[in-house]
Amino acid sequence: MKKTVYTKFILAYFLFALFGFLVVATFISRAVTNLVTETEAQNLYKEAIYIADTYASDLYTSETSLETVKKQLDSLDIYLNSTLWIINPSGLIVLSSDMPIDVDNPVTVEGFSSADNAEHYYRIGTFYNSFEENVLSVIAPITNDFQVLGYVVIHKNISDIVDLSSKILNISYYLLIILFVLS
């Protein structure tokens, strides 16, 4: 009798460990990735709005030069670990933090449509095949007198978001191990 109760207890303990691992690996993993993605998108959107209201707006109202705004974008590129673009409504890249200023050879985002971004302020993908890997792209309008002059677009590699999610998920695994050891 004593031996079967002990065996059942050990079996229940291992089942609890297995189900705990499965819950962390599936539900918690997805929840953490979604949370990190949403948080990063919100933070980048705040930055994009700030850029649209200051540097980019000044560029379109001729209060500053391309070079000045380019320096600001380059600094923010390093700070945010992201690629920043200023594009016009037809998809022409006016400035990019990862390309030098070259007005003679403009680059256009093929297929860009501002209507695609009407429902959500961010998207995950290759941004109209502009990148080889998936990125989190946040877009904010540059406006003046209620007219859209262009857009600030910030792209962050999904691999950076996945790395951060994995680090947070590792904490869940450590807590699960501690729970099993203490029980």
Go through the PLM ranges and name each one:
Residues 86, 127, 141-142:
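Hydrophobic beta-strand positions
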Residues 143-145, 153-173:
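Helix-start (N-cap) segments at beta->loop->alpha junctions
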Residues 169-183:
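Selective recognition of signaling/oligomerization transmembrane alpha-helices
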Residues 96-101, 154-158:
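Short beta->alpha transition motifs characteristic of CBS
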Residues 1-92, 98-101, 163, 170:
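Juxtamembrane segments flanking the first transmembrane helix
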Residues 136-146:
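A short, hydrophobic, proline-anchored segment that marks a local hinge/packing element in signaling
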